Amino acid sequence: MRGSLRTTITAASALVFVVGVFTMTASPLISPNASLQSEQEGPSGYQQGVARVADGWVFTGTTVMARTNEQLKIVKQNTQPIPLEWKRKGFNHVGDPDVAGKFLYAPLEQPQYERGDQAIARYNAKTLELVDVVPVTQHEASFITVDPKTMIAYSMDRFGGNALLRYDVRKKWAPLPPLAMDRVVENVQGADIADGSVWLSTSDPQNNLYRVDLKTGATTFLGSAGHVGGEGEGIDATKLKSGLLHVLTVDPTRNPVWFGHFDVS
């Protein structure tokens, strides 16, 4: 049922959901682990991305977006988030968004990746009304995340890699030197910024999660978002009672979309 809550109480039950607590064996130090705390059934049709707002969430689907309350009941929709002008340019996909201040930022993607042009749209985070669209020079655009302190935005040129693109939002999205990562992360679907890190969700074979240090680019494996065989999607990183990481994962049967809440220890 939509908005229903399932809680993982023990490590054994976490394994039932194909969510384990993972450790890195290459170092004597204990690495962070993402562990599932609870899980909800997400709103149908909104599987691409998620961002936190004051009284709930914003979810994106391929060509739609909606704001929900804490129980994931839809309270506001934008069924045409891609403006006609950009549809005519081939843009047909909304990715994983982010909220900074009073605005929602969402990547708009067109599928002819070798053109090397994508776009970032800005919306009123409360009403979901479009404010403007900015073109960016990158091949793919599965996510955008904006650091609210610096107003530097992060994305990736391709659907995975070993660097995060950076833009100065205050200077009309002027490109900045990329943040080099110390490992390649494939199939990145979503990202969000919290606690001095960029947190990544992927749709690799295990739907793995990663943390990238904003200062050093050190990239740490955190574990799986679960539902292996399904597709990992967007992520939000906000400290709540339910956890720090909030991740969308499409069920292996394609329905429902799971909204998992993870602590990182």
Predicted regions and their residues:
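Surface loop/turn motifs at the tips and blade-to-blade linkers of beta-strand repeat domains
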Residues: 38-43, 79-81, 85-89, 133-139, ...
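Blade-level signature of beta-propeller repeat domains, shared across WD40, Kelch, NHL, RCC1
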Residues: 234-265
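Conserved blade-ending motifs and adjacent loop-strand segments that build the rim/top face
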Residues: 187, 218-239
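Beta-propeller domains
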Residues: 57-83, 115
